[in-house]
């Protein structure tokens, strides 16, 4: 289990708006954009948001999204899921990743 620092959801919302919102929505019933809607993300397996067209790499990764998996994925998405179509380079700063995860945990329920 990764040593994940406590995040600040308010700061994480700013990270989401700046780095993620161009391709993702978080609200229940939100539409897919270039990337899938993230509502219900925690506890869902990779490649499983209904109605979104995923790569085989995402569908076949077979992990369940949670703090630990998001921590590793958000640092370097293409390393964690080679073949993903997510073009985001990742968040190298631990505090930004922790804040974003705190925001996602709160906003995608």
UniProtKB/Swiss-Prot annotation:
Its main location: mitochondrion. It is found in: Mitochondrion intermembrane space. Transmembrane segments: none annotated. The keyword Transport applies. Keywords: Electron transport, Heme, Iron, Metal-binding, Mitochondrion, Respiratory chain, Transport. GO terms for cellular component: mitochondrial intermembrane space. It comes from the Eukaryota. One of its GO terms (molecular function) is heme binding. Pfam families: Cytochrom_C. Binds 1 heme c group covalently per subunit. Heme c binds at residues 20, 23-24, 86. Electron carrier protein. The oxidized form of the cytochrome c heme group can accept an electron from the heme group of the cytochrome c1 subunit of cytochrome reductase. Cytochrome c then transfers this electron to the cytochrome oxidase complex, the final protein carrier in the mitochondrial electron-transport chain. PANTHER family: CYTOCHROME C (PTHR11961). Belongs to the cytochrome c family. This is Cytochrome c. It comes from Pectinaria gouldii.
């Amino acid at each position: 289990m990764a040593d994940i620092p406590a995040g600040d959801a308010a700061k994480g919302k700013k990270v989401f708006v700046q780095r993620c919102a161009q391709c993702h929505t978080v609200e229940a019933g939100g539409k897919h954009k270039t990337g899938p809607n993230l509502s219900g993300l925690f506890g869902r397996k990779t490649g499983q948001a209904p109605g979104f067209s995923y790569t085989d790499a995402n569908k076949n990764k077979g992990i369940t999204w949670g703090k630990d998996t998001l921590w590793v994925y958000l640092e370097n998405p293409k390393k964690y899921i080679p073949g993903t179509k997510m073009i985001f380079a990742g968040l190298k700063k631990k505090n930004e990743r922790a804040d974003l995860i705190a925001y996602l945990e709160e906003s995608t329920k």
